[in-house]
Amino acid sequence: MYKQSWELLGNGQHADLTVAYINARIIDPESKLDIRGSLLTKGDKIIDFGPDLFANGIPSTIDEVIDCNNNILLPGLIDIHVHFREPGQEHKETINTGSKSAAAGGITTVVCQPNTIPTISSVITAKYIKMRALESAYVNIEFYASITKSDNSLSDMALLKEVGAVGFTDDGMPVMNALTMRQALSYSSMLDTVIAQHAEDLNISNNGCINEGIISYELGLKGIPDISESIIVNRDIALMKNIKNVHYHILHVSSQESLHIIKQAKSQGLKVTCEVTPHHFTLTERDIMTHGSLAKMNPPLRTENDRLSMIEGLKSGIIDCIATDHAPHDINAKELPLDTAAFGIVGLETMLPISLELYHNGTMPLIDLLATLTYKPADIIKVPRGRIKKDYVADLIILDLDHEWVVDISKFASKSKNSPFHNRKVKGKVLRTIVSGKTTYKAEIII
């Protein structure tokens, strides 16, 4: 059992307030730092840290002292793939409820996808997102803007970047037109920003609902072949080869074949990155039999070989980061037959404990796993976060690495509860989330 509390981020910590974090195991994945020590913040910045920071005692001028009780103090997590449904589908999620869920999961920065209603393809909608974030968020809100407008012409990418877009995607749908994609890649290279693709050939997926394979055959359902993903990955990488300084990112990669193509592109020196969701390296198509529509997402859960390939991709570095594809849906959209239920699951409050299974079962070193959740996603979107460094923004979390608990969707801060991980026993609990020096979430474990 645990008691949770939240506080809105607003403008972050008061500029002159100093906070000392003591008795911490400080981990910074980028520098491979893993020490016992203390850390000092002032306002929204990290001032200093180290094993001997308060060797002569804590100065009386410190405004607040937080005892980490030998738990881990690490950079706040960064999730570059969330759907907060605002504007247009606020009955499923809002920036307020989604960011509240993120804070509970130790995520201090999220990137909202642009498939809202209307899409983030205009400056007006982009400014609305920024306004709502300032009014109602618990964490940092970034956003991708749309590659295309409703008429399939390119968005004004330069203008949208100017008002804050950290990249461009049509996520939820692929950019099917190869010429449009080539133009988008070309323009993005001039803007020094990332193009992120939902890799799916709609002609091949053909309105399928789960992975094409033994389970789809058993259930008599139309399947989505894995080649529907890899064929778009292959096409887009071919398109980018003659464009200088272009960065292409594949969202929620799910197939072994896609990883083979990505590995080859990286070996050729192309700037190709990709992400994987926790559900794609934890579950398979067989989980459909247990969880039904709660295990329906796009791309679909695939085979055990694909799942193991995702883990190998994380271990080898072919996969750059973990992202949730947090896709909230109300109960009416999910409690339907598999062929008509909505795609997607929520994931913000389970991302860290599910990912930590790879550490607890001996698959990945802790510091390598945490890299995929902190500075690596930060670098994809070019934001100066995800690190513990002097003068860096104080986005931090305190993690009880070994605390065991059971996922309970009724306790989720998200408006929606569509998760296949309900009742799963996990290990690793976020005790405090600090954004710009300000505590926005606390969990008090009640024994």
Swiss-Prot record:
It comes from Ehrlichia chaffeensis (strain ATCC CRL-10679 / Arkansas). Keywords: Hydrolase, Metal-binding, Pyrimidine biosynthesis, Zinc. The keyword Metal-binding applies. Catalyzes the reversible cyclization of carbamoyl aspartate to dihydroorotate. Substrate binds at H83, F84, R85, N115, N298, H329, F343, G344. This is Dihydroorotase. It catalyses: (S)-dihydroorotate + H2O = N-carbamoyl-L-aspartate + H(+). Zn(2+) 2 binds at D171, H198, H252. GO terms for molecular function: allantoinase activity; dihydroorotase activity; zinc ion binding. The active site is at D325. The gene is pyrC. Belongs to the metallo-dependent hydrolases superfamily. DHOase family. Class I DHOase subfamily. Gene3D superfamilies: Metal-dependent hydrolases, Urease, subunit C, domain 1.
